């Protein structure tokens, strides 16, 4: 297998299961390689860790929910795989630059909290 095949498999795995708990071990198993190898390869090819990629992907998905649904922030956090609302808020603000509520309002999303 080419290195890019492993990365593609890892990304597909994350993108189809982001709403569930995912560990680096799970990603490695899906790719059929050891954890250390996929971590090293992912960082080399994507310039980020698997964990950070997963978090950013979850935040991207949460933005879609915030704009296109009237779900509460807590519900959105749960739908995208965050089981800790404080951690979701912290990561959302770190990545997007504003809170989920501010983002929803700035994008004209439905205003329910």
Give the residues covered by each predicted segment:
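Terminal helix-turn-helix DNA-binding modules in bacterial transcription factors
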Residues: 12, 16, 21, 44-89, ...
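The DNA-contacting recognition helix of HTH DNA-binding domains
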Residues: 35-36, 40, 84-86
């Amino acid at each position: 297998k080419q290195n890019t095949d492993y990365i593609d498999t890892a990304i597909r795995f994350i993108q189809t299961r982001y709403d569930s708990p995912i560990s680096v071990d799970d990603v490695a198993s899906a790719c059929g390689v050891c954890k250390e190898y996929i971590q090293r390869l992912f960082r080399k090819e994507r310039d980020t860790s698997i964990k950070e990629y997963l978090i950013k992907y979850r935040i991207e998905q949460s933005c879609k929910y915030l704009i296109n649904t009237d779900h509460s922030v807590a519900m959105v956090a749960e739908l995208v795989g965050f089981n800790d609302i404080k951690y979701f808020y912290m990561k959302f603000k770190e990545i997007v630059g504003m809170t989920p509520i501010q983002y929803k309002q700035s994008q004209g999303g439905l205003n329910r909290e």
